[in-house]
Every structure is written in structure tokens, then in C-alpha cells.
């Protein structure tokens, strides 16, 4: 007789389909027997079929196609194969449904009345499964209607809600050890087994360990069945790579004048990130994190937009050739400046808080830092130096209320000297006494009047060895040497960190290379700038050149005197065709620090900026409610036209290209 195999399939309609397939292919056609009743009838049908085909039931039994389902029939294991239907996420789905029913109070059949007649609704099945006391009450109490009421007159409703959260979700956060002890007493009252919420070694979970103040509710150890209660909410903070670097910068050198690094700063993106990173309070922390993520997105979009559509296209070409090293150096510092676009060039106290200057960072209260070395790359100095002094000697004093102490340097290479002008006639003792009074009285540090122009120059005299570089005032700058005022990299523009071999060039290329003319570039700049203090609000001030001669730094003579390189070989210079474009643009941008010129203006407020990237960052952060309104559905809307963009980078590229004229302050009244 042919050996037949039986396949029993369970469908959603609970019907059994029996398929008999001969072992030998082609010996007999498959037979399908269907039934909509029970498995017993299916077995009977199979037996009937086998008796009809083989002649008796004994041969059918020997063939091994009898099965037994819930006691109906026989089963021979070596011939019968059972199929199993596995529900992979059964427990997870059940917990989700039970939790949703508890939160929405759906199909609740248990009413708990606590102290103060406050009620809590729950489900009998969940509480009876965990609490023997609730199970006993439900078994002994006749159910008159669908809802059973249980009174707990001495239990506060807040503790019962914590207990229900623990029973429904398997974990709960408590605010203090006292709450934990109350919850522990409630668990004991309901006769809930200690193995559910205690460790197996019998240690008291209510006493937190000093080395482990946070206990995870889902932590499983050896011999533990269940979970433990957490007594303190863990603080979760996410800090991006840019946030870590910014917080490090602000902690190292971003402090206010005459104070420690922990002093609160003026309004700036850096200080906001640093303060938001240390906040751990609920919804406020989440809002700050969302704002920080948005600001990171804005900064990244502006950087990508500048990389795709650079303000200076020539910088993408000036990498190869004999001057490639120096060009890479300029490009590196220009890229570092793009990362510093959090320093706004607006005003500290502009209306609506929208005109925040990056120069106001550090807590000094001034509208901006002025000064640096002419011809220095603008990207090489993210925090320019302000050197302002008169023609007086070392013993000359300064005007009352016109100066501020020096801020500490942000890095090892950048010296930030913020010293105002001083009168030509004065006594040395009076100047020292006034300086001491200014150090003792912080309220005397006020912003210098913007109506008096200032000539910037560098005073080079002898300085004592014991002078403190971190607290340079009028007296110390009057006696300071050139080495203290200017780092060596200013006096030697060809100093690099490469090997000495980089300074040697082929003799055939010496004729094509030519040193740059610093003085010629300065006097032949597009505008003969007049050096004045930083201005407020809108530009438009003009001073007479006779009253204010152009800024000519005195270190140019030292540059000419030190023209010879420290090596015997001639120094390597950039070709003039590169310097004529690259250096002049950097010089023009840098001179805005001294002149106070802000060619970029915001049309939505009174803020003005020295660079376009600062204005774009201002539009995307301060006026976020306009470009990223809630009704826009997460998309970005142009504030000058009705175009809508999917990403922030597309909007920044659109503003920088199509509406470039609207960003200029000279077209403000058009």
C-alpha cells in the first residue's frame, strides 16, 4: 500500500483542510477533504476514505495517518507533523493595548476611591493578577453591576497613580526617597509580592546607593524576576559636536571683562548653547534642545550654501601652484570664520533683541571690538584686536569713564586688547590711581562716547618683566614692547608651521614671485577709510579726513626692516595675480572692523551686519517665526517673496542669490 501523508491546516475560519498526497509522484491524484466542524470529523473522514481505498481500517492504521487532536483519534509521531503559528510580538502588543486602555480609561470596571474622595479607574484583571488583596476582594464581593468600587481612605491618590503606572507599564519614576517609601508601603498593603519590585538578595531598594544613584526600572540581574523602582529621573542631554566645541571655547576665553569665565555673557548663540546644555528641567530642556538643533541646522545650511556658492569664487582655484601652501592656509582660516557666524554684528540693545553683535560676546557690554592688523586675513581673526591710544607717553592718563579693562585672550595666538584713547597731558600717579579705582569699581566701566573719533596706533616702549598680559590697561600698554602687543606672526607674515624646506624655491621661479606691498594696498584700498569708533543703528556718519587721518599702523616699518627671512634662502611669496584679488578683499572686509561700516542690513528690524553670513544667520534664527511659520507645514518661506522651500539650505541659497540687493544697507530705502 502506498504511504500517505496528512497535512492539517488551521485557517482563520477555524476550518480543517486535509490533503492526502501519495508518496510516489504520479501514482495517484491528490485528494482534498474539507470540513467545517471539528478535528474528530476530519479524522473520521480520513479513516473512511482509507477504508474505502485500502479495504480495511487496519491497513490505514499501519499506514500511520491517524492523528489525535484534543483526544480525538490516534497519532503516530514519526508520520504526523504539527504546524505551529507563532505570534512574535504577542506580549508587546498586549502591553500596548492595556496601557492605552488605562490611559484613556476604556472599558474600566474597577473604581478606586482614595483619600479626599478622589477616584482612579482601573481594570480588575490587571490589579487582580498583581495583588492578592484585590483578587480576594473581587472573589468575595458579589458583582451587582459592571463596576466594582474599592475604598482606600488613607491612601493619597498620587501614590496610587504611581502604583498603577508601575503595574501597567512595568516601571515608574519617583521624585524622592520619601515617595518611594510611600509606594513601598502601598505595595505591602496590596500584598504584592516582593519579588516583583525587590532584588532577590533582600536588599532594600528604597536606600539608593551613593555610587549608583540611578536605578533603571528594566535592569535585570541574576535571579531577579521583574523590575525595580527608580527613585530619581535621569537627566538626558544630547550635545552635538559643534556644541561641545562651542562650550569649550566659551569656557576657555569667552568671559567678561575683569571677571571669571563663568560670568554670564551677553546675548549670543554660544552662550545660549552653553546655558542650554546645563539645563535639566523638563519641557524647558526639550525646547532648548529643539532650538539648538534648529540653530545647528541654520549654521550648517549657511556653511553649505557658502561652500556651494562662495562669496569669493577665486578661493576654489587658488590651491595648486607654488603658492598653494599659503592659499590653503587662507582657505582654512576662512572656513574657520564661517563656523564663527554665531558672532552677530548687530547691536546689543537693538529693538526686539535682533541686533546682537558677535563683538558683544564676552560680557564687556561694548557694541563691538575694533582693530587688528591691516592686511591680516579676515578669516584669520575671528575676534579682532582693538588697539586704540593717543600720542601721549607712558605717564599719560585717560579720560574719565572712557575705557574698559582688557578681555582675556580666546586662544594662544590671539591677543585681545581693548583700550580706549587717552589724553596727551596727565600725571603718572593720577593715571595709576584712576586705574585702581576703575578696577575696584565695575560700574565705572562704561562705553566710550561715539561722538569722539579715535586714531588707532601702536605705542612701542619698554615694559617691565612682571607685567600681567591678562590685565593690560592704559599704563601697561604705554610701557608695552612690540613683542607683547603683536605676536611674532604679525611681524613675520611668511612664518608657517611647515618644514624649513618649504621656504626654498627654484631660482627660475624667483622672478615671477614678488612680495606684497602692504603700504600700497592700504593706501590704494577702494575707500580711504576714516578710523572712528563703532556706531549704532544705521550707517551714514562721515568724519573729515583732516580731523581723522587714515589708519597707518607703525609696524609697517618693522616689516620692511625684517624683510629678510631667518633662513639663508629667499622666502616663498604668493604670485601677485593671486594676492591682488585675495588680499584686497580680505583687507576690505577687515577694515570694516575699524570703520564701523555694516553694508548688510535686516529689513525686518534695525540690525546691521558686516558680513552676509551673519545677516543670513540672523534671519533664520531671530525671525524664525516668519520663515518657518507653523502654518507652513515644516517648510521654509522667503521673507521677501512668496516662494516656499523644502530645506533651509535652499532658502539660504535663494536669499543670497535672488535677493542679494535687498540684503545691502545701501538699498534699504528702495
Swiss-Prot record:
Stored InterPro entries: BTB/POZ_dom (IPR000210), Dev/Hematopoietic_TF (IPR051497), SKP1/BTB/POZ_sf (IPR011333), Znf_C2H2_sf (IPR036236), Znf_C2H2_type (IPR013087)
GO cellular component labels: nucleus
GO biological process: female analia development; female genitalia development; male analia development; male genitalia development; regulation of DNA-templated transcription; regulation of transcription by RNA polymerase II
Comp. bias (Acidic residues): 407-419
Polar residues compositional bias, start-end: 218-230, 451-464
Alphabetized CDD domains for the sequence: BTB_POZ_BAB-like
One Pfam family in the UniProt entry: BTB
Subcellular localization(s) per the UniProt record: Nucleus
Positions with biased composition (Gly residues): 351-368, 389-400
Composition-biased stretches (Basic residues): 325-338
Keyword list, A-Z: Developmental protein, DNA-binding, Metal-binding, Nucleus, Repeat, Repressor, Transcription, Transcription regulation, Zinc, Zinc-finger
Zinc finger (C2H2-type): 586-594, 600-623, 636-658
Residue ranges annotated for the BTB domain, each copy included: 108-176
Region (Disordered) location: 200-288, 307-470
GO molecular function: DNA binding; DNA-binding transcription factor activity; RNA polymerase II cis-regulatory region sequence-specific DNA binding; zinc ion binding
Function: Transcription factor required for terminalia development. Negative regulator of the JAK/STAT pathway: represses JAK/STAT-dependent expression of ventral veins lacking (vvl) in the posterior spiracles.
Protein name per Swiss-Prot or TrEMBL: Transcription factor Ken 2
Protein's gene: ken2
Amino acid at each position: 500500500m502506498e504511504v500517505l501523508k496528512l497535512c492539517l491546516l488551521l485557517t482563520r475560519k477555524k476550518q480543517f483542510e486535509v490533503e492526502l498526497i501519495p508518496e510516489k509522484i504520479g501514482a495517484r491524484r491528490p485528494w482534498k477533504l474539507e470540513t467545517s466542524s471539528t478535528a474528530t470529523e476530519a479524522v473520521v473522514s480520513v479513516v473512511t476514505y482509507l477504508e474505502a481505498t485500502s479495504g480495511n481500517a487496519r491497513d490505514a492504521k499501519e499506514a500511520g495517518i491517524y492523528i489525535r487532536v484534543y483526544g480525538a483519534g490516534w497519532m503516530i509521531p514519526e508520520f504526523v507533523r504539527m504546524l505551529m503559528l507563532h505570534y512574535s510580538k504577542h506580549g508587546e502588543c498586549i502591553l500596548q493595548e492595556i496601557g492605552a486602555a488605562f490611559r484613556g480609561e476604556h472599558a474600566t470596571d474597577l473604581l478606586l476611591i482614595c483619600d479626599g474622595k478622589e477616584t482612579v479607574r482601573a481594570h480588575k484583571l490587571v490589579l487582580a493578577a498583581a495583588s492578592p488583596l484585590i483578587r480576594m476582594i473581587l472573589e468575595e464581593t458579589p458583582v451587582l453591576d459592571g463596576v466594582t468600587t474599592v475604598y482606600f481612605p488613607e491612601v493619597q491618590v498620587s501614590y496610587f497613580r504611581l502604583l498603577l503606572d508601575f503595574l501597567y507599564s512595568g516601571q515608574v519614576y519617583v521624585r524622592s526617597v520619601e515617595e518611594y517609601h510611600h509606594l513601598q508601603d502601598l505595595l505591602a498593603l496590596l500584598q504584592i509580592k516582593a519579588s516583583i519590585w525587590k532584588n532577590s538578595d533582600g536588599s532594600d531598594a528604597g536606600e539608593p546607593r551613593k555610587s549608583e544613584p540611578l536605578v533603571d526600572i528594566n535592569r535585570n540581574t541574576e535571579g531577579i524576576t521583574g523590575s525595580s523602582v527608580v527613585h530619581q529621573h535621569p537627566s538626558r542631554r544630547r550635545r552635538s559636536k559643534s556644541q561641545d566645541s562651542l562650550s569649550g571655547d566659551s569656557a576657555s576665553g569667552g568671559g567678561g571683562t575683569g571677571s571669571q569665565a563663568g560670568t554670564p555673557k551677553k546675548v549670543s548663540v554660544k552662550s545660549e548653547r552653553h546655558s542650554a546644555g546645563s539645563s535639566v528641567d523638563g519641557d524647558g530642556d526639550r525646547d532648548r534642545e529643539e532650538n539648538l538643533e534648529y540653530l545647528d541646522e541654520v549654521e550648517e545650511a549657511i556653511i553649505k550654501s557658502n561652500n556651494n556658492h562662495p562669496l569669493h569664487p577665486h578661493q576654489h582655484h587658488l590651491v595648486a601652484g607654488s603658492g598653494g601652501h599659503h592659499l590653503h592656509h587662507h582657505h582654512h582660516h576662512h572656513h574657520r570664520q564661517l563656523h564663527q557666524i554665531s558672532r552677530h554684528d548687530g547691536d546689543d540693545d537693538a529693538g526686539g533683541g535682533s541686533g546682537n553683535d558677535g563683538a558683544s560676546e564676552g560680557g564687556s557690554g561694548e557694541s563691538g571690538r575694533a582693530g587688528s592688523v591691516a592686511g591680516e586675513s579676515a578669516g584669520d581673526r575671528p575676534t579682532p584686536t582693538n588697539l586704540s591710544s593717543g600720542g601721549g607717553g607712558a605717564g599719560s592718563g585717560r579720560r574719565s569713564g572712557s575705557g574698559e579693562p582688557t578681555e582675556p585672550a580666546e586662544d594662544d595666538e590671539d591677543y585681545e586688547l581693548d583700550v580706549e584713547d587717552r589724553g596727551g597731558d596727565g600725571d603718572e600717579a593720577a593715571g595709576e590711581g584712576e586705574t585702581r579705582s576703575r578696577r575696584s569699581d565695575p560700574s565705572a566701566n562704561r562705553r566710550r562716547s561715539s561722538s569722539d573719533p579715535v586714531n588707532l596706533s601702536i605705542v612701542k616702549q619698554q615694559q617691565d618683566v612682571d607685567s600681567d598680559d591678562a590685565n593690560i590697561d592704559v599704563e601697561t600698554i604705554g610701557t608695552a614692547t612690540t613683542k607683547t602687543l603683536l605676536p611674532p606672526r604679525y611681524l613675520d607674515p611668511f612664518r608657517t608651521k611647515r618644514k624649513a624646506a618649504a621656504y626654498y624655491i627654484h631660482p627660475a621661479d624667483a622672478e615671477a614671485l614678488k612680495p606684497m606691498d602692504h603700504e600700497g594696498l592700504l593706501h590704494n584700498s577702494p575707500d580711504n577709510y576714516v578710523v572712528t569708533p563703532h556706531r549704532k543703528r544705521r550707517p551714514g556718519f562721515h568724519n573729515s579726513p583732516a580731523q581723522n587721518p587714515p589708519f597707518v599702523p607703525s609696524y609697517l616699518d618693522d616689516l620692511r626692516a625684517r624683510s629678510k627671512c631667518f633662513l639663508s634662502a629667499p622666502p616663498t611669496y604668493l604670485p601677485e595675480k593671486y594676492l591682488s584679488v585675495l588680499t584686497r578683499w580680505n583687507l576690505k572686509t577687515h577694515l570694516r572692523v575699524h570703520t564701523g561700516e555694516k553694508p548688510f542690513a535686516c529689513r525686518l528690524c534695525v540690525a546691521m551686519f558686516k558680513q552676509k553670513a551673519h545677516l543670513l544667520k540672523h534671519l533664520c534664527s531671530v525671525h524664525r517665526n516668519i520663515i518657518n511659520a507653523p502654518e507652513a507645514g515644516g517648510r521654509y518661506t522667503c521673507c521677501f517673496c512668496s516662494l516656499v522651500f523644502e530645506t533651509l539650505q535652499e532658502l539660504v541659497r535663494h536669499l543670497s542669490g535672488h535677493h542679494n540687493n535687498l540684503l545691502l544697507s545701501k538699498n534699504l530705502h528702495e
